[in-house]
UniProtKB/Swiss-Prot annotation:
GO MF term list: ABC-type D-methionine transporter activity; ATP binding; ATP hydrolysis activity
Gene name as annotated: metN2
Name of the protein: Methionine import ATP-binding protein MetN 2
Compartment list: Cell inner membrane
Summary of subunit composition and partner proteins: The complex is composed of two ATP-binding proteins (MetN), two transmembrane proteins (MetI) and a solute-binding protein (MetQ).
SMART domains per record: AAA, NIL
Record's catalysed reaction(s): L-methionine(out) + ATP + H2O = L-methionine(in) + ADP + phosphate + H(+); D-methionine(out) + ATP + H2O = D-methionine(in) + ADP + phosphate + H(+)
Length: 369
């Protein structure tokens, strides 16, 4: 049996009755996880941790949740496997409301939802093999089946040669790979990642992201992750939601949100990823034109690589490219251009309208002489 077939999602017969029909006809555009009017207030706290969350997470996508500290990211993530019980609203998994689940149903649900953590949560007195095998032993899985599953999972995460060692002998990245293998032992449909790369160096983070991407593609898992590292969202996620004080303030495809953030919170979170203006330009920027010879400085976010000569001709006047670059997010190339426009025949309003013909987003940075 191949790894992919051995680790594929549970058969419809293993799902709750209401979800079986959905599983027989999965649609990547249908909601795998759906939040409806979700709210959460902790005892003794006046400010809700979550409020009015309406959100869909699609089958097979990698979905990111970002926000400032205390925005409600972990609270939202933990409602998916009901480690947190909402105060209001509903959480639906494959169109099934999980709120009324009893203990047996919750056990079955949590076996369908794997979870990995920032600090690995491995048992130091057990080997790599034993750490991965433990949930299967607790579930009463036969020894032969346990051995087969653990062997396949350790091969999947690239640790088959480390099966006999203890966590203290592993690097941080290797420990997280053990955590990922353990999270997959019950062949889940959903994988929750709670700051899974925050304790890792950049090189190790990249390798873990590549592993998660491979698992997503090969096994068809829906992956939901929270992180404070915006580069992680950019590099791996298909869509993203931004939370602030427990509410959704922005959501969409990653390339659109990162290329043209609309909300102030989103712009603040993404600021470290933005190319910095040259120091000389930053120092010379003024809020208003100082004279008739002043040039307006524009930042344009464009899809693909525009024909600069045609863009400059459309803007009119004397146009200078002060800074530019292109990066790829997902399958989309996004360019960022910093231009100064002097003596344009168009007033500022007309100039911005013309710039928007070419750009996903246009921002006036200021004026320079």
């Amino acid at each position: 049996m191949s790894q992919a077939s051995a680790l594929r999602a549970p058969t419809p017969q293993a799902l709750p009755p209401m979800a079986r029909e959905q599983a027989l006809r999965p649609d990547v555009n249908e909601a795998h996880v759906r939040f409806i009017g979700l709210g959460k207030t902790y005892p003794g706290q006046a400010q809700p941790a979550l409020q009015g969350i309406d959100l869909n997470i699609r089958h097979g996508e990698i979905f990111g949740i970002i926000g400032r500290s205390g925005a409600g990211k972990s609270s939202l993530l933990r409602t998916i496997n009901r480690l947190e019980q909402p105060s209001q609203g509903r959480v639906l998994i494959d169109q099934v409301d999980i709120a009324p689940f009893n203990e047996d149903q919750l056990v079955a649900l949590r076996r369908r939802i794997g979870m990995i953590f920032q600090h690995f949560n491995l048992m130091s007195a057990k080997t790599v093999w034993q750490n991965v095998e433990l949930p299967l032993k607790v579930a009463g899985v036969a020894k032969a089946e346990r051995q087969r599953k653990v062997r396949e999972l350790l091969e999947l995460v690239g640790l088959q040669e480390k099966h006999h060692v203890y966590p203290a002998q592993l690097s941080g990245g290797q420990k997280q790979r053990v955590g990922i293998a353990r999270a997959l032992v019950h062949t889940p449909e959903i994988l929750l990642c709670d700051e899974a790369t925050s304790a890792l160096d950049p090189e190790t983070t990249a390798s873990i992201l590549e592993l998660l991407r491979d698992i997503n593609q090969r096994l068809g898992l829906t992956i939901v992750l929270i992180t404070h590292e915006m580069a992680v969202i950019r590099d791996i996620c298909h869509r993203v939601v931004v939370l602030e004080r427990g509410a959704v303030v922005e959501q969409g495809e990653v390339w659109r949100v990162f290329g043209s953030p609309r909300h102030e919170v989103t712009r603040t979170l993404l600021a470290p990823l933005q190319a910095k203006l040259p120091a000389a330009l930053q120092a010379s920027l003024q809020a208003h034109p100082a004279s008739g010879n002043s040039a307006v400085v524009l930042k344009l976010t464009v899809l693909g690589e525009p024909e600069l000569s045609a863009l400059f001709n459309d803007l009119g006047g004397r146009v200078r490219l002060l800074q530019g670059g292109v990066e790829t997010i997902g399958e989309h190339a996004l360019g960022q251009l910093i231009l100064s426009v002097q003596h344009s025949p168009h007033d500022t309003h007309q100039l911005l309208e013309r710039a928007r013909r070419w750009a996903e987003d246009v921002e006036v940075l200021g004026h320079v002489d």
